[in-house]
Amino acid sequence: LQDGMLLFGEVGLVGEVRAVSQAERRVTEAIKTGYTVCVLPESNRASIEKAGNLDTQKIKLIGVRHVRELLDCVGL
């Protein structure tokens, strides 16, 4: 992983990346801790951006739907 990158989500049996609870809270804590990139389930990313409660200038949110996309994001 690159420095400052955080990953979270639930991975299903066929590789789908599922939403998790309290995603906005997790991203808020990541910002406070100095993370600059967050790879998370696409549905969580969309919900966070729609709510508009976070300063997305401080962290780049990358939504993924499948492990293949996740691996591309981290360069594997």
Where are these regions (language model features)?
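Peripheral, non-AAA+ core regions of ATP-driven protein-machinery
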Residues: L1-L76
